Amino acid sequence: MRIDILTLFPDTMRAMLGESILGRAQARGLLDIRCHQIRDYTENRQKQVDDYPYGGGWGQVMMAQPLKSCLDAALADSTVPVERRRVIYLSPQGPTFTQAKARQLKADYDQLVLVCGHYEGVDERFIEACVDEELSIGDFVLTGGELGAMVVTDCVCRMVPGVLSDTECYTGESHWAGRLEYPQYTRPETWEGRTVPEVLRGGNHAEIEAWRTRQSLERTLKRPDLFQETPPTPDEQRLLDKIRRDRSRPQLTEPPICRAATEDDLPAILAIAQQARNYLRRHRVDQWQGVYP
């Protein structure tokens, strides 16, 4: 998988994307991540990449020429077929990036070109001429597209075979199948009075799997929109019904207390005995349940 990032801050991007899992994957040749300085492709001595917007208004707009020249340079040595390349502009106006979208990008393309805007955005003519699609990482506005580009890069690249040790490293995580992941614990067994659930320490894999399934569904109940996107299976629905029933039952704030009787309890015990005697005589029955005051 090749990722080309067009940005005004390539050194920052390289530093972040060259660490940890993605850094090791690049060293092993599994990923090819390249960061291109847009400012290197300007046609003026000042290295200016932006100008005032037509029609007035606040801020500056990135010019189409340096963006197009930078894009051309990024694609010049690409051996990836055109149909397997995708140019994406990170923008708050695009559809929201999701795990499903990441899977689609990973499956359909071998090269992604991520364009990072800045200031008030980029000249619309560049988007019309060169961009295949816009993507947003949420309904908020950032200073530039760099954070969005890092999010897309990390999410897509971790699904490249060999980047993670096993496919289960990401197929069992939140959002992969429209569900949120169950809680995770590690050593020590007890920390600040909080203990790892007993089921996870028992070694019964069937019970552990059942616990994790229930915990995953309980967490996903916090995001009902996920059930709309991926409706529950019949088995999940039965478990969800049980979870809701369990939640609707009143919970005892304190457990019942039992203790041995003392001399102080003798008057109450005698009173119960008298109640029993009177009840048996009056109703002519041989069983009675007294109420301890």
Language-model features, listed with the residues they occupy:
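Structured adenosyl-cofactor binding patch, chiefly the S-adenosyl-L-methionine
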Residues: 122, 126-173
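S-adenosyl-L-methionine/SAH cofactor-binding core of RNA-modifying enzymes
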Residues: 63-118, 161
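Conserved GNAT-fold acetyl-CoA-binding loop/helix
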Residues: 270, 274-293
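N-terminal nucleotide/polyanion-binding subdomain common to many enzyme families
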Residues: 1-77, 207-221, 225-228
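A short beta-loop-alpha structural element at the N-terminal edge
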Residues: 257-271
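SAM-dependent methyltransferases
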Residues: 1, 188-255
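Internal, active-site/partner-interface "lid" segment
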Residues: 147, 159-199
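Extreme N-terminal starter segment of soluble prokaryotic enzymes
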Residues: 1-4, 85, 256-257
